[in-house]
Design a protein with these regions (language model features):
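Short acidic-hydrophobic, aromatic-tinged amphipathic segments that line or gate anion-handling sites
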Residues: 98-102
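Amphipathic alpha-helical interaction surfaces in cytosolic regulatory modules
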Residues: 21-97
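Short beta-strand/loop segment at the start of cytosolic alpha/beta domains
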Residues: 1-14
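Conserved beta-strand segments of the P-loop GTPase G domain that flank and frequently precede/overlap
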Residues: 14-16, 46-47
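Generic beta-structure capping elements
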Residues: 8, 16-19, 80
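Short alpha-helical segment
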Residues: 105-106
């Protein structure tokens, strides 16, 4: 699995370096993103610009990551490709997450 993270001020940016988040990788993705998010991160941006496909298992992993953040901490999404954005729209997950066109716009 390929995730990287960096801080921009107090904002943690986690980038997914993969083309698919599906049932085959969802559990590992969830575990790795949880490991990337430390207790100091009050605001997390998940950069999905490299992801071209996501299924319900992938959505579930992202929702689980959001639920890990408690006490006013938040998870925003950035850089969704048109295909991934469509999945978020069809499942109405676009009403659950704040979605930005890019990481720069999310900052």
């Amino acid at each position: 699995m390929a995730l990287s993270s960096r801080y921009h001020g107090k904002i943690l940016i986690v980038t997914a370096h993969m083309t698919h988040i599906d049932a085959a990788v969802a559990i590992q993705f969830k575990d790795e993103i949880r490991a990337e998010i430390d207790d100091n991160a009050q605001h997390v941006i998940l950069d999905l610009a490299e992801v071209n496909f996501i299924d319900s298992s992938g959505l579930g992993a992202i929702v689980a990551s959001m639920k890990q953040l408690k006490g006013g901490r938040k998870l925003d999404l950035a850089g969704l490709t048109p295909t991934v954005a469509k999945v978020f729209q069809l499942t109405r997950m676009d009403t659950v997450f704040k979605i930005h066109t890019s990481v720069d716009k999310a900052l």
